[in-house]
Amino acid sequence: MTALFPFDNSFARLPDRFFARVAPTAVEAPRLVRLNRTLALDLGLDPDRLESPEGLDVLSGRRVAEGAEPLAAAYAGHQFGQFVPQLGDGRAILLGEVVGRDGRRRDIQLKGSGPTPFSRRGDGRAALGPVLREYLVSEAMHALGIPTTRALAAVTTGEPVIRETVLPGAVLTRVASSHIRVGSFQFFAARGDVEGLRALADHAIARHDPEAAEAENPYRALLEGVIRRQAELVARWLGIGFIHGVMNTDNMSIAGETIDYGPCAFLDAYDPATAFSSIDRHGRYAYGNQPRIALWNLTRLAEALLPLLSEDETKAVAEAEAALTGFAGLFEAAYHGLLNRKLGLTTMRDGDPALAGDLLKTMAENGADFTLTFRRLSAAAPGSGPAPEPEAVEAVRSLFIDPTSFDAWAERWRRRLDEEPGSAAGRKALMRSVNPAFIPRNHRVEAMIEAAVERQDFVPFETLLTVLSRPYDDQPDFAQFAEAPEGGGRGYRTFCGT
């Protein structure tokens, strides 16, 4: 019989100081909540075997699969601006890597699988609520077209975990292009371990930026690749109203994937100062701050890479600064290009950033819902065909406390659309493809978690997962899931769940 996971491991070949070899801790009575059968097939796995007792034992950590080399990775990181020289996987264990049907290499990691040498007096376990949140939101992000880690399985353990209260335990099987973080490089830089730093950088180049190996300065090319991916990723976050909530350097993947969903949330009423995380007391990681924080984190990566950029410190700093100066242009191009598409614009004119910015300003002043405003604009967009239905225009106006403020902006928008090529139908299709009808509304996510944790009712989880798998379709039978919460979601708080 073939192996359950056809592991082909590369990170485990690195020197021992990169990780601690540790096996998952067995649990008493695991039960499969959800297997992502589609993802399993994409990875070349057999979903039926994964759902069998054999598969459940591996997905819960009761048994180590054939070919697995379980380990907890070492890394450091800046947490809310303060450097911590040793963090590491405190409740996650990398089982190994598989190469999917598309030829891409992915990590298979268990979260909540027990203590590791990096647990820092923690129990290494995860509660059911955070596991379901990450499963649901990461899969929703994938459906929205945002680069992200994925969820292969969620399993309850049959054991309690002690947090503020006693909660049911769970294990998430996470799939990622890798788990190399900015903090991974900081770990070696902080120790003056240049050879370890070089080995990690060479591994990262081979895995994520193979073309960088041929560059004049491969390590600068690696840095530039990470900068580009992060600039594009954060622009896409802003485009759907996503707030990560804890953008520490140990939570920034060099693969350019969204990772670590602990206190994440989505905008309801548009306000760039929105920060939902209970531990983000000063709004460091607020929605509108995310591009600035991304650059701050990337600057920390550049600092860590200085010994590799050049043996001459002055030249190394110049190389790092030259790479970092590219972030602003990359982000602005990605962000304003996305905003233009959200407004039905396929060409870029000098006044377009101001047009989009003025809409956002008007939305903030009027408490307009971010997702509903852009989705309803899709139906209200004028064009060379028939005028939009009055009901479609009124549906947008009704989102603004002062509808006349929207009217003034909409007139400018209509004049700008008159300059665009293409048909009204094509414009509407474009807008609908980038303006989702459905996002993981915070109040819906909380209701789903409450049902599962308090009543062992997983129907809301399954329903929400189904709806969010088609975020750009209207789905009239599930229209209630597109609705904004009362009060625009103000006062909502998220918690890390560790």
Swiss-Prot record:
- List cofactor names only: Mg(2+); Mn(2+)
Any idea what job this protein has? Nucleotidyltransferase involved in the post-translational modification of proteins. It can catalyze the addition of adenosine monophosphate (AMP) or uridine monophosphate (UMP) to a protein, resulting in modifications known as AMPylation and UMPylation.
Q: Keywords on this record?
A: ATP-binding, Magnesium, Manganese, Metal-binding, Nucleotide-binding, Nucleotidyltransferase, Transferase
What family does the database annotate? Belongs to the SELO family.
Molecular functions (GO terms): AMPylase activity; ATP binding; magnesium ion binding
Quote the catalytic activity from the record. L-seryl-[protein] + ATP = 3-O-(5'-adenylyl)-L-seryl-[protein] + diphosphate; L-threonyl-[protein] + ATP = 3-O-(5'-adenylyl)-L-threonyl-[protein] + diphosphate; L-tyrosyl-[protein] + ATP = O-(5'-adenylyl)-L-tyrosyl-[protein] + diphosphate; L-histidyl-[protein] + UTP = N(tele)-(5'-uridylyl)-L-histidyl-[protein] + diphosphate
Q: Which PANTHER family does this UniProt record tie to the protein?
A: PROTEIN ADENYLYLTRANSFERASE SELO, MITOCHONDRIAL
- Annotated InterPro entries: Kinase-like_dom_sf, SelO
Q: What is its EC number?
A: 2.7.7.-, 2.7.7.108
**What's the protein called, per UniProt?**
Protein nucleotidyltransferase YdiU
Active-site feature positions: 250
Kindly name one Pfam family recorded for this protein.
SelO
User: Quick one: which residues bind ATP?
Assistant: 88, 90-91, 111, 123-124, 174, 181, 260
Residue positions binding Mg(2+):
251, 260
